[in-house]
Amino acid sequence: MAGASVKVAVRVRPFNARETSQDAKCVVSMQGNTTSIINPKQSRMFLKASFDYSYWSHTSVEDPQFASQQQVYRDIGEEMLLHAFEGYNVCIFAYGQTGAGKSYTMMGRQEPGQQGIVPQLCEDLFSRVNVNQSAQLSYSVEVSYMEIYCERVRDLLNPKSRGSLRVREHPILGPYVQDLSKLAVTSYADIADLMDCGNKARTVAATNMNETSSRSHAVFTIVFTQRSHDQLTGLDSEKVSKISLVNLAGSERADSSGARGMRLKEGANINKSLTTLGKVISALADLQSKKRKSDFIPYRDSVLTWLLKENLGGNSRTAMIAALSPADINYEETLSTLRYADRTKQIRCNAVINEDPNARLIRELQEEVARLRELLMAQGLSASALGGLKVEEGSPGGVLPAASSPPAPASPSSPPPHNGELEPSFSPSAEPQIGPEEAMERLQETEKIIAELNETWEEKLRKTEALRMEREALLAEMGSPGGWRTVGVFSPKKTPHLVNLNEDPLMSECLLYHIKDGVTRVGQVDVDIKLTGQFIREQHCLFRSIPQPDGEVMVTLEPCEGAETYVNGKLVTEPLVLKSGNRIVMGKNHVFRFNHPEQARLERERGVPPPPGPPSEPVDWNFAQKDWLEQQGIDIKLEMEKRLQDLENQYRKEKEEADLLLEQQRLYADSDSGEDSDKRSCEESWRLISSLRDELPPNTVQTIVKRCGLPSSGKRRAPRRVYQIPQRRRLQGKDPRWATMADLKMQAVKEICYEVALADFRHGRAEIEALAALKMRELCRTYGKPEGPGDAWRAVARDVWDTVGEEEGCGGGGGGGEEGARGAEVEDLRAHIDKLTGILQEVKLQNSSKDRELQALRDRMLRMERVIPLTQDLEDDNEESGLVTWAPPEGSEAVEEAVSNDHSPAVRPSSPPQSSWERVSRLMEEDPAFRRGRLRWLKQEQLRLQGLQGSGGRGGGLRRPPARFVPPHDCKLRFPFKSNPQHRESWPGMGSGEAPGPQPPEEVTAPPPPPNRRPPSPRRPHRPRRNSLDGGSRSRGGGSTQPEPQHLRPQKHNSYPQQPQPYPAQRPGPRYPPYTTPPRMRRQRSAPDLKESGAAV
């Protein structure tokens, strides 16, 4: 039995009254064990899955394919009960949306033929026990009943239990509930009574605390023990089986159920439990399919999964029943349930027989002896010869131990068996150090467990009887006479009474309150019928039962002052005569139906017509609530419209705030043409859409988003004509290096929802699936993550579909289509996507290789430019010496050296820079644009010179000249590098291709050069760029005939004083290499030379 898969069955129920009133259509079909569901909006799209059992209960009993309660039990219940007798742990749990039929399948009704799996299994259990019981074989049965509500555990069989119980995990026993009552039973009647008592306690607690039973998980556990005596060895062995019958809470959405406030919080806790259960099932399925690298299973994330740890993927034989609604209005919930069940099929449980290890060893040896005997007899050995082996087998050296020498009991150090196997013993030194308080608590808990294990069967029966008496006293105190024998099963034939109504059919009509002759008081203190709750007063109301002369008993309801009491939805302030079938609401949560059997019989005999109203609708909790809302003047439709309007106004307000924030961020970051604005818009849109989706269904979300629009930064978006290779995305609030697959899935969901919303929700399911596959592959490659499981994109597409839904009216008809049409279309689309993705990857690789080549060439060019000026500068340093000055002082000896190195006959005269300083000062004062540009340029030059001085100080005597300036890509030239004629002459200029660096000093008395010739400059640190205006033969071949203006002398300034002042001389030391002018300055400086040349010509 080890390694068996979980049994999965699906069952579809008939239409209920709400679905019938809305003219719902059936979208679920079954053929054999295959179940199919069709999308009501796109009939060609359907889901088909195969399960172990598919039960069609949508029609009536006359249908030959109809699955009754007995058939469901024969297929699932009998098999699980057989495993329990074999010694395995067993679990059956039902899952589905609210109202899908889980409680009916598990519990059923009291009518014959309507009982569910739990009553039938319990009845069949005791039937087999009575048949198989003998002197060598005995049985014992213990039961417990608990409820998990909002992650709190309550004991439903112990009236003294107050509050929630604590869930703990023992290293040997596994997870268990501390102080949970475990009651001994001897017959099916005892179990039925305990289940009724548990349902009553559940109903009372739910009504008093304003809870809904469909929002709580109920776990009914049966501990079945088999004790056998082996006559051969004289040993007693036990096999213990735990049967867990779980009725999960209904899975529902806040928008479909209208949950708000506390109901929404309850739903969040239920969704937490069910979501954790789904995570556990997915993790176990991935573990079986070898898709999961880690063995961690999140059992402890919720109380439900923690308690079901052994039943899910552990030591248990498990079966799941998925309850389905056939209506098209519940398509999304039904589809989710089917996917849930399909994942559960992949789980495999390793179940073992729970028995003593010695007994197991003896059993295995006996089976071996029997097999060898059959083998010897098959070979022709007589039975008389085999009989002589018994003495040898009983000897110490034989196969079986002798009866006179039973095996020694296990030592205290060896722990009891767990799941049929011995756990390794833990030495005290291996255990972690614990504090004294924890040690004392653990000691008390261990002593309590030992006391429960050593408790005799008679003591357990006495404990069960004591708890039964306490429950009877509690029910009598509440005003429910008749005890536990009649409540919820029998109703009085003549006495008027009240029957409770509840949203859950399992908890409805299980509490009965008699109205005695005379006065029956209702309230919280000193009353006959005790109710508790926020809106129940100490003296709430009273019932007067007065016999009439004709024998009829008339019951009158008299409310107390200030107490809220409603009859058929109307507030009662004066005494009112009750009729059989009236709906009574006391406070806000206690709903009852008044039954008067004798009055109803007399009316039928008199032929009194029934009261007006729909005769087919039963008088249940929904009918009472609807009646109460209508009489109170509360129109549900108007309330929903008002709520939608409020949500729309809130969305508009948040959108305006998001628009303002995005506009501020765009202006601050100055990224109108980048993609940062789109990223921020995507995040804000996802925030608003997800918050709106938590409150409303997808179609309503689409309507509001279409009407109000999406958040935008004001940037005009150009339509994308071709697919663009995406840039690297930034995950919000997380380092991309630590991004997980869940983060990538969430990012893909955000981007796809944003694109779908931008396209006015025109995407169909196939397009969303294609986008999901492309986005996931794209994100995985971008962040260097493995693509992981092949169905990761399916989860993304499902989340997108659940968030944005489908456009209203799209996906029209077209009939049923062929069975594999959708699959073929998806495969073709996926192949096309793979092809496009491959092309994009090749283009990306080519672009990256070209970028690498360009970068290598750029680095090589920069290295060459650094080497060439350094060689020329070294030659100049060997020839020149002296101080480097920025302004040419008089009487400098370096002039002669400069003249000797120059091939020109004369040296250029030096002119005082007074005119240049005056012009610069005038422009600085008059032209603000010139002032800003010059200050910006000077700041850059100061930073450059500081860097040169710092590197020169560290490098010693020689220093490499700065490399040629390479402007960044797509960088616009800013002022002062503009072709403005009035600014050109203000910049200190120099000869063609000469850098404005430090020059050797010149004599003032040197003769001027000839006017018709410009001497060539022997010192050029580098060759100008070919595209510059001062480079090439045009500036060097045809020299200018005009003498060089005085304001074109090289000049450097650190400040802008009002009067021109020469720069002080530098400190003596290693001279600096000539300064290399950026290309932009040379292009601007060449313009005056061109003008002079043109004027001369």
From Swiss-Prot:
Domain of life (superkingdom): Eukaryota
Residues modified to Phosphoserine: S294, S491, S671, S673, S911, S1028, S1086
Q: Name one GO molecular function term.
A: cytoskeletal motor activity
Ranges for domain FHA come to: 520-587
PROSITE patterns (alphabetical): KINESIN_MOTOR_1, KINESIN_MOTOR_2
Q: Where is the composition biased (Pro residues)?
A: 404-418, 997-1015, 1059-1077
Positions where Phosphothreonine occurs in the chain: T1077
Cellular localization per UniProt: Cytoplasm, Cytoskeleton
| Name of the protein | Kinesin-like protein KIF1C
